[in-house]
């Protein structure tokens, strides 16, 4: 017995040494690194997951020597909250590295999509350009210009929605003041003529020109000005006009010509672009643009959940108001995004949950005031067994419990749950543990079923038989097969217990019962009344997305990567940016006295015994210094402004004369 104990101690000791000596990074702050998705001279780009919300993010790693360069990007990026702009969640500083946790876009760059497709149809191009114009309009109204718009800096999320990124060249600009700039930056093939000539330029006009280059590449499949020789490319930008194929529609050709006008004074403003007939004929109107700010209801829900798990609300409020990009601010944004997705799905009226080969349950709210919940009805016994087996895994028990606290504050959690070595699956309600332990875990659907208790279950048929509702019967369940309307009592029933008191039953093996592969449309109402009106429709409702065809050929857009380009940056004018530079450029103290790790009392009850799938313990104390800085307040410029400028009324703002162009690095721009 003693020999076995010594052997276990020795093995544990060796594992500890191997973990400490392993040069590979496994965790950065509250993020678990999964893989490397990019690499350049600035550092590596990792795919990671937030440990407490299980949300995938991108970690951009940079050296501390580039703190001044990163300060500009962080300063502008952290205050941009728009559905078509990549989100900056958190900035984690270690002894020698700086990590930026940003939104993950699984479908990569728009450049790669255009290279595969060669060119896009006008309908798809219109949708992409509309989303991109909405992002640019928001950016300009925030008093900021991008100055490096290109296909490589536009990313696509899971649904192929546009996400604008890479704000390394961004600069404060006020449309009402009509500020001139003189720093040469960006990518040559996307640069405006006045910038290439070395003249002073207006940042908004440069962004409009770049929009025209992007639209040209989407419709035609190549860049209008792109040569291997940089000087030849510049000469074409200044002297030549792009060729417009006759296949283009009248409105698209009209918009392209206005965007690629050589005279910046004749280019339209972003508000005029959004009102162009090209978008109106495709069903996009400026009146349909919604306020990107999250609703107060979603914010209140997230605050209550964070307060429930013990977060210091004073510190959280300070992080939000000052946009510190620390651990609390990142946690807040991740949960707020989940809540916003939940509200958007509620507005559509249908929820979809797919679990392998089991029957999916679609829940349609009867009225907006009624609560809704999400239930998974599994007709496959193997799926059920796998789910139970996974939920009993002791390595995930405490993390699952914490997530259920976070997403379901109304759920009662006893002290037995903490002390148990495994979380037992509970059937009375669809809690967070059951969703977390399923094989095909969908974090977007997790929060759909939270904060809801189910008392009354009403099943509605699909659209074809929506008007066929039965009268209220207290004891008999009716099944609508589309052919008959008679009471049906099957001998074999499956039971889904929703609240511990009332069961919903339907036939498991019957000729009149729906097949195992069909989807059921269910509406769950929660008034204080008994079980009523059960109608089952066997008609499947499945979502499908046509995959993008893969082409072996490659567009001439790829040639833009061959030219050599460099970058330069002007001084950061904002006071908050100067403070930011001093923070992230300062090195940790080299004093002999060991600096005590800051401890946050809100996590006292959680930080000792977290365990994850790999078996490695996790301490929720902050293990990396985050940036704390106060963003200076600024007034938003006038929203209605035209870039038809008068030279005599323009105020010039001097910048140090520098010449720099960016290279077309993959996923994130290579900082030189």
Curated annotation (Swiss-Prot):
Keywords, ordered alphabetically: ATP-binding, Cytoplasm, Kinase, Meiosis, Nucleotide-binding, Phosphoprotein, Serine/threonine-protein kinase, Transferase
Low complexity bias locations: 508-523, 549-572, 639-649
Enzyme Commission code(s) on record: 2.7.11.1
Modification Phosphoserine occurs at: 231
Pfam (any one): Pkinase
Sequence segments annotated as region (Disordered): 375-396, 416-436, 464-572, 632-672
Binding site for ATP: 37-45, 60
GO molecular function: ATP binding; protein serine kinase activity; protein serine/threonine kinase activity
Catalytic activity line of the entry: L-seryl-[protein] + ATP = O-phospho-L-seryl-[protein] + ADP + H(+); L-threonyl-[protein] + ATP = O-phospho-L-threonyl-[protein] + ADP + H(+)
Cited InterPro entries: Aur-like, Kinase-like_dom_sf, Prot_kinase_dom, Protein_kinase_ATP_BS, Ser/Thr_kinase_AS
Enzymatic class: transferase
GO CC aspect terms: cell division site; cell tip; cytoplasm; cytosol
Function: Has a role in meiosis.
Similarity field: Belongs to the protein kinase superfamily. Ser/Thr protein kinase family.
Name assigned to this protein: Serine/threonine-protein kinase ppk16
Organism expressing this protein natively: Schizosaccharomyces pombe (strain 972 / ATCC 24843) (Fission yeast)
């Amino acid at each position: 017995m003693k020999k076995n104990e010594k052997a276990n101690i020795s093995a544990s000791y060796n594992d500890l040494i191997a973990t400490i000596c392993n040069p590979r990074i496994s965790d950065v702050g509250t993020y678990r690194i999964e893989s490397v998705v990019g690499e350049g001279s600035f550092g590596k780009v990792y795919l990671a997951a937030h440990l407490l919300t299980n949300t995938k993010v991108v970690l951009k790693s940079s050296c501390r020597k580039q703190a001044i360069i990163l300060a500009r990007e962080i300063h502008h990026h952290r205050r941009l909250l728009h559905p078509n702009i990549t989100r900056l969640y958190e900035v984690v500083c270690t002894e020698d590295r700086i990590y930026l946790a940003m939104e993950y876009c699984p479908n990569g760059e728009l450049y790669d999509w255009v290279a595969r497709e060669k060119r896009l149809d006008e309908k798809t191009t219109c949708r992409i350009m509309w989303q991109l114009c909405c992002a640019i309009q928001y950016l300009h109204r925030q008093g900021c210009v991008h100055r490096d718009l290109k296909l490589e800096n536009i990313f696509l999320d899971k649904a192929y929605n546009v996400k604008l990124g890479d704000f390394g060249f961004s600069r404060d600009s006020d449309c009402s003041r009509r500020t001139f700039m003189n720093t040469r930056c960006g990518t040559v093939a996307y640069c405006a003529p006045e910038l290439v000539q070395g003249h002073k330029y207006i940042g908004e006009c440069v962004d409009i020109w770049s929009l025209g280059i992007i639209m040209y590449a989407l419709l035609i499949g190549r860049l209008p000005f792109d040569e291997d020789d940089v000087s030849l490319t510049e000469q074409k930008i200044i002297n030549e006009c792009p060729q417009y194929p006759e296949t283009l529609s009248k409105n698209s050709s009209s918009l392209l010509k206005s965007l690629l006008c050589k005279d910046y004074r004749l280019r339209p403003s972003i508000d005029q672009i959004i009102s162009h007939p090209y978008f109106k004929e495709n069903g996009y109107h400026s009146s349909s643009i919604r306020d990107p700010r999250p609703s107060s209801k979603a914010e209140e829900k997230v605050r209550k959940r964070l307060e429930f798990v013990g977060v210091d609300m004073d510190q959280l409020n300070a992080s939000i108001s000052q946009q510190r990009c620390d651990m609390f601010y990142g946690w807040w944004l991740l949960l707020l995004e989940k809540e916003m997705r939940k509200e958007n799905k509620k507005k559509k009226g249908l929820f979809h949950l797919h679990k392998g080969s089991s029957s999916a349950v679609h829940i349609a709210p009867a009225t907006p005031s009624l609560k809704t919940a999400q239930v998974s009805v599994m007709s496959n016994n193997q799926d059920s067994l796998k789910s139970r087996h996974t939920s009993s895994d002791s390595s995930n028990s405490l993390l699952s419990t914490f997530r259920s606290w976070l997403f379901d504050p109304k759920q009662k959690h006893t002290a037995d749950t903490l002390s148990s070595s495994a979380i037992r699956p509970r059937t009375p309600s669809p809690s967070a543990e059951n969703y977390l332990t399923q094989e095909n875990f969908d974090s977007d659907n997790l929060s759909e079923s939270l904060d809801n208790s189910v008392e009354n279950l009403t099943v509605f048929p699909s659209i074809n038989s929506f008007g066929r509702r039965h009268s209220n019967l207290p004891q008999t369940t009716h099944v609508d097969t589309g052919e008959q309307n008679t009471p049906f009592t099957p001998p074999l029933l499956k039971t889904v217990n929703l609240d511990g008191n009332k069961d919903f039953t339907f036939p498991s093996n019957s000729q009149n019962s729906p097949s195992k592969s069909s989807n059921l449309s269910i509406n769950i109402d929660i008034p204080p009344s008994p079980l009523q009106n059960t109608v089952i429709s066997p008609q499947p409702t499945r979502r499908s997305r046509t995959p993008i065809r893969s082409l072996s050929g490659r567009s001439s857009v790829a040639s833009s990567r061959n030219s050599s380009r460099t970058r330069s940056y002007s001084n950061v004018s904002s006071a908050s940016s100067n403070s930011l530079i001093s923070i992230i450029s300062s090195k940790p103290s080299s004093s002999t006295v060991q600096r005590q790790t800051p401890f946050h009392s809100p996590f006292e009850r959680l930080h000792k015994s977290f365990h994850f799938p790999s078996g490695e313990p996790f301490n929720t104390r902050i293990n990396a210094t985050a940036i704390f800085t106060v963003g200076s307040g600024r007034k938003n410029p006038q929203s209605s402004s035209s870039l038809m400028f008068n030279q005599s009324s323009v105020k010039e703002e001097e910048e140090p004369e520098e010449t720099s162009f960016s290279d077309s690095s993959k996923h994130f721009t290579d900082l030189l």
